[in-house]
UniProtKB/Swiss-Prot annotation:
It comes from Gallus gallus (Chicken). The gene is MAFF. Disulfide bonds: none annotated. It is found in: Nucleus. PROSITE patterns: BZIP. Pfam families: bZIP_Maf. Monomer and homo- or heterodimer. Residues 51-114 form the bZIP domain. One of its GO terms (biological process) is regulation of transcription by RNA polymerase II. Residues 79-93 are annotated as: Leucine-zipper. Belongs to the bZIP family. Maf subfamily. Residues 51-76 are annotated as: Basic motif. Keywords: DNA-binding, Nucleus, Repressor, Transcription, Transcription regulation. This is Transcription factor MafF.
Length: 149
């Protein structure tokens, strides 16, 4: 019977500890390590332990979800920035492409004109008298070159 008296006394002490243990705030509950949490949960009923552990799990999941949302927003902003940069690059390349096509068309026209001239010369022979053109070369001095730049 002494053992029964001792065990009932131990249960009474545990209940008293559970009743006297201050409740943990949400911040404290999340900040505790598992070892510290288990130390705080000693003497509490199984239901109370389960309730506090579930509360801790819920709070931690809420924190993880919030950080995930922040990360997703940051990634979205970064992707939008990259998209704008790529759209700008595509526009720039389209303008360069259009300019090169224009230059290509101009060169193609000159090439076709030269081919036509070559065919004419080949079919009729060289012209009897070719008009020569004078070529004037203008050399710019350093001072004049700065004025033209």
């Amino acid at each position: 019977m002494a053992a029964d008296g001792l065990s009932s006394k131990a249960l009474k002490v545990k209940r008293e500890l559970g009743e006297n243990t201050p409740l943990l705030s949400d911040e404290e509950l999340m900040g505790l390590s598992v070892r510290e949490l288990n130390h705080h949960l000693r003497g509490l009923s199984k239901e109370e332990v389960a309730r506090l552990k579930q509360r801790r799990r819920t709070l931690k999941n809420r924190g993880y979800a919030a950080s995930c949302r922040v990360k997703r927003v940051c990634q979205k902003e970064e992707l939008q920035k990259q998209k704008m940069e790529l759209e700008w690059e595509v526009d720039k390349l389209a303008r360069e492409n259009a300019a090169m096509r224009l230059e290509l068309d101009t060169l193609r026209g000159k090439y076709e004109a030269l081919q036509g001239f070559a065919r004419t010369v080949a079919a009729h022979g060289p012209p009897a008298k070719v008009a020569t053109a004078s070529v004037i070369t203008i050399v710019k001095s350093g001072a004049n070159q700065a004025a033209y730049s």
